Amino acid sequence: MQALRSLIYTMLMVLITGVTGVIVILSALLPLTIKQRYVIPRTWGLFLTWLAGAICGLKYTVEGQENLPQQPFISLWKHSSTWDTFAQMFVVPPAAWLLKREVIWIPIVGWAVSTYKPIAINRSAGHSAVNQVIKQGRER
């Protein structure tokens, strides 16, 4: 039964993510700031997390949110599942995303992500990738 629920959730997640990607791309044409448009990925993350709870029984606890600094900061997540991608959208405040540059080449999803002007790095570039993150991070 769990396998069937997981399959249903995955199919809905792919559909919802595709539709959300199109909405994000279209929203980039509006005279809105990135921060104003951030409501879209935030809602996407909240909805997919709720859906995972409703269909698959996902339960989670966020601890330490009160310790997030008020000034800009770097949030590092050990990427262990698809869920942590969703959670980042609503657990931390709107942020500049850091990702491997290949992600922006993914049709619809990557194009949508690129409208938020992420810091896209070449992970094989070593130290120069770190310098790129520092430089672009300071600019934001």
Features from the language model and the residues they span:
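A transmembrane-helix-recognition feature enriched in membrane-embedded lipid enzymes
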Residues: 1-61, 111-112
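Soluble catalytic domains of membrane acyltransferases
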Residues: 55-140
